[in-house]
Amino acid sequence: MPYKHKIPIYTENLNLTGAYFRHQRIIDGLSLTYVADAISMNKGFLSDLENGKRNFPDGTINQLNDFYNLKFDDSLKFYIELENNIDEIFHALCNSNTFKEKQLLELILSKRDIYENSSGFFLFNLLNLFYLIRFNCNETFINDAKKLIESNLDAINSKDLSIFYCILGIYYKRNPSTNFVAEKYFKKCLSLSSNIPDIAALCTFELISIYAETNRSALAYTYCEKSRSIFNRLQNYTTMFFIDFFQCNCLTNLGLYESSIQKLTELLNNIDQSSNKYISTMYHSLAWCYLLNCQYSECIKYTNLAIENKDPSCDLCYFIPYSYYKQKEYLKCLDYIESHLEYADDFYKPFLQSISARIQKQYVDFEKNIILYYQSLLQNNVYEGIPLIQNFILDYYTETNNKDMIIKILIDIKSFNDKDLTLKSSTLFVDSSS
């Protein structure tokens, strides 16, 4: 085997050149045999070059450039340039400096012609994926960029691979139904980056909401503590505010409502309420906590404050009518639903319709709509709202003395508390296995 020249540590053992030409051959739809014959090279030797097992002899890169009609530059200049940039960009992401993050990414993408013909090709495409996930969200482009990186992991160092997994985690975390996919990527990221503060910090932080949303609130609470410790060392106090906020939500999910209300109120008192853009989210969390704690007047108060401050959350649509229902203010409840139903998100309409049907003793409509909504919660892994609905269903079957259904919903409640309730395991759906 030819002697391998010593190269900088962050490129050692990376297959930058071989992977580049391998990728080109594959996208051109050419077989290894065809290319080897066309350039009069041994097939096994060409395979070794493509897979980083041999150095490229003098003249071979030019030979392949001519064959593919490319202008590949194998110097490390552009790779090193991008390596420095990706660290700066990720640091901006970790510090919530979205303006700088986007500005740097757009500057790099403006030099596509340079980077795509250099040793920085794969790192450039990783940064392109970074931009797509953070600022474009075109699913087709994201999947194409993801496949390109996944097919050439031998050209990505472990630190950049951890960034790849982290941004994929961010992408899949946006939809509750893919939270478990996001968790897998964040864990992969942490396995590679435990000693890289920025990456470990962001991954740990992102896992908080995943655990909270997937009925693992105690674990989410412990990750709040882990995350706070890392961000404190980084002196990233902005993110520490969010950690405190998430910890309040964990307390709510654990049923520690008074502790959550106290902590949320302290956070509210410690910020400038006239300018803070997250004030509506905090009102929302307080409204939700009061709803679960059966303090319905307070729930209505903070729901209205959240709406007045333009909180975008769709689930607010049922806080007020449900509170009216529980307070036996049935006319107010029906009037509210009638005037707001057409503006509600389709996901929550069955719940609103079930409340209306329950008041009017339209039992068939109630059962149809509440089961449809419960099924949607399970199907989309929206675990946070499940206990409220389970108790709503239990109250109904208790009132109608349907012992078979009481047993079924009690089994589901136990499964939820045991952390193993899924759409498939739920006892309420005859067709749950389909």
Name each region found by the language model:
Residues 1-28:
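A short, Lys/Arg-rich alpha-helix, primarily the initiator
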Residues 28-48:
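Short alpha-helical DNA-recognition segment
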Residues 57-74:
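DNA major-groove recognition helix of helix-turn-helix/homeodomain DNA-binding modules
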Residues 69-85:
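Short C-terminal boundary/hinge segments that cap the last helix of small helical domains
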Residues 84-95, 123-137, 163-177, 201-215, ...:
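Tandem amphipathic alpha-helical repeat scaffolds
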Residues 93-108, 133-149, 173-188, 214-226, ...:
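Helix-turn-helix repeat elements of alpha-solenoid scaffolds
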Residues 106-113, 146-154, 187-194, 225-236, ...:
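Amphipathic alpha-helical segments of tetratricopeptide repeats
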Residues 116-122, 156-163, 195-206, 234-246, ...:
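Alpha-solenoid helical repeat architecture
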